[in-house]
Amino acid sequence: ADACSGLQGFLIFHSFGGGTGSGFTSLLMERLSVDYGKKSKLEFAIYPAPQVSTAVVEPYNSILTTHTTLEHSDCAFMVDNEAIYDICCRNLDIERPTYTNLNRLISQIVSSITASLRFDGALNVDLTEFQTNLVPYPRIHFPLVTYAPIISSERAYHEQLSVAEITSSCFEPNNQMVKCDPRHGKYMACCMLYRGDVVPKDVNVAIAAIKTKRNIQFVDWCPTGVKVGINYQPPTVVPGGDLAQVQRAVCMLSNTTAIAEAWARLDHKFDLMYAKRAFVHWYVSEGMEEGEFAEAREDLAALEKDYEEVGTDSFEDENDEE
């Protein structure tokens, strides 16, 4: 950072489930808050998949790290391995995706998010602007990430997708990087980052079409503004990789109450193990206290509650008060 003339912030890549990904990251985030208090910290967090598991103690690690980093992180983009596995199988016809396949998909998202810092465009969005537009309350900083088009090289020869098509596919649960259903939640904020051969007029038409759909709900206390970024640099892909070279792509970042589903799933798994105090001795022998588990779990329960509250309509609250 000392060699950097205009430090904007930090991008931190880690997993929730592993010991290093959760434990070391928590320590690092705390140190960064002390040493670089004002700089933004964006996380790309690999969230434990609902069905497949790499470690039995994933729920513990995830909840402990979320609790510890909640106040230190400005924005955390969640990605879950299972969602990406499914996308690789379904959209790219890869029977047994490897970590390389998964990482190439995630790297497209990171590339889209940072493109505005690196290239020129009609509407550029920088790192701090993301936070301003996506985070209505400090704790509610877990946007859902969707990317389109995800098509294999074979299929791209005979189909180039329009702006309207890639925009509408962003609202399909199948293209999301976390397993949850936005049709069950409400959108608080939405950011569309287009790149390649895209003009503002097409974007406006596409977004207007989305807003007429009834199954996409915004909270009533937030104007249904969609923040748009357009970058003229077309998406680049790894030569010989799985993804097709396309003329245009979009990455959607949306803050939706549906992501609370993911927390609820994780909390449930935590509760099942913690009720029996299973595996807790490993943590205690490393110097942790058992009380820290309960504290972290309470914080997550509060986070679920926060999501529930922001999703309720404001006129309901007024009626309650009367």
Curated annotation (Swiss-Prot):
Keywords: Cytoplasm, Cytoskeleton, GTP-binding, Hydrolase, Microtubule, Nucleotide-binding. The active site is at residue 129. Pfam families: Tubulin (PF00091), Tubulin_C (PF03953). GO terms for cellular component: cytoplasm; microtubule. Coiled coil: none annotated. InterPro entries: Alpha_tubulin, Tub_FtsZ_C, Tubulin, Tubulin/FtsZ-like_C, Tubulin/FtsZ_2-layer-sand-dom, Tubulin/FtsZ_GTPase_sf, Tubulin_C, Tubulin_CS. It catalyses: GTP + H2O = GDP + phosphate + H(+). Its cofactor is Mg(2+). CDD domains: alpha_tubulin. SMART domains: Tubulin (SM00864), Tubulin_C (SM00865). Tubulin is the major constituent of microtubules, a cylinder consisting of laterally associated linear protofilaments composed of alpha- and beta-tubulin heterodimers. Microtubules grow by the addition of GTP-tubulin dimers to the microtubule end, where a stabilizing cap forms. Below the cap, tubulin dimers are in GDP-bound state, owing to GTPase activity of alpha-tubulin. This is Tubulin alpha-4 chain. It comes from Gallus gallus. The lineage of its organism: Eukaryota, Metazoa, Chordata, Craniata, Vertebrata.
